[in-house]
Amino acid sequence: MTEVRVGIVSWNTSALLDRCLGALSAALDGLDAEIVVVDNASGDDSATVAARHRGVHVVVNRTNEGYARAMNQALADTPAPVLIALNPDTEPPPSSLAKLVERVHERPGAGLVVPRLLNPDGTLQPSVQRFPSLPLALVSGFVPPRWQRGRLGQRWWLEPGAPHDRCEPVDWAIGAVHVLRAGALGGMPPYCERSLMYAEDLELCWRLHRTGWQVWLEADIEIPHVGNAAGQRAWGWQRRHRYWAASYDVVRAVRGSAHARAWAGVNLAATAVHLAANRVGSLTAGPAAARRRHEAAVLRSLLPVHGRVLATGVPRLEAQPPASGLR
């Protein structure tokens, strides 16, 4: 009997995909698993690389269908009670995925479990957050970092390491490694397809919470994750624009247009404050000043993103490929 379906979506990430697939057998530790790789019209040899791995079923899309739609393809039509949405820029250690599947069965209220993510250098990669809200935006945007410690930081998960150092329910988790209970989805596809990429993980976690399921962080299970391999290639630093557009769409759908516009107003003001601080810091010399100048350019580019939502509401998402050739 099939115990788990593993879905991976690749777009021009063949080298990372090869390492990820090479690690799967040991990571699944004997589980009866189906492995499906959906290639989103890559310009590299992702599909060929995937086909070299034994037991991997490869689906090749003629056009880039976006991450959510492609992952839904990968996880569809299976009797498996557990579904794993896995990014190709992860390299799961031996037994890691098997342990996460076991946690799904051990926690009857868990609709989704996720590991603690690590950067390639072994440092913590923050991956779980509070749901977007006006209080969180105010605290994170305007309270000085040195004051985001202790009880305040713990409450809003702003303090480094919190809550990544313990196993507990969380609000939402980025989608690098999602281990899902199929029965928690109510017959629906896992991911919302309104956006080409980004915030589908936020929408899924919100949906699970609203239907009575928990999202669990399993902090004692660690998986390395490069992060934004496809997004960086597609949009560069402008991926932040895509992220914010998709996030506003989800917040509007869940909390309403008025809340989304108010959230945009807080984000706009906070971005302006941070931009001013970065401009001051960029007046010095050295690498730190160069980083601040780059960050200032990014922040400046985000002002109209937040401003448009505040002024006219959340725009209709256009699932268009970027000019760099994502298609």
Tell where the protein language model's regions lie, with residue ranges.
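A short, conserved alpha-helix in the catalytic core of glycosyltransferases
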Residues: 163-166, 171-222
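A conserved acidic beta->alpha catalytic loop
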Residues: 23, 39-47, 63, 93
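Short, acidic, metal-binding catalytic loop of nucleotide-sugar glycosyltransferases
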Residues: 23-32
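Non-catalytic, C-terminal membrane-associated alpha-helical segments of glycosyltransferases
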Residues: 238-246, 257-327
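Short, flexible, basic/aromatic active-site loop/helix in glycosyltransferases
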Residues: 132-170
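Glycine-rich, basic loop-to-helix element that forms the pyrophosphate-binding segment
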Residues: 60-78, 88
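Short aromatic/hydrophobic "clamp" motif used to bind/position activated sugar donors
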Residues: 83
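Conserved donor NDP-sugar-binding/catalytic core segment of glycosyltransferases
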Residues: 93-127
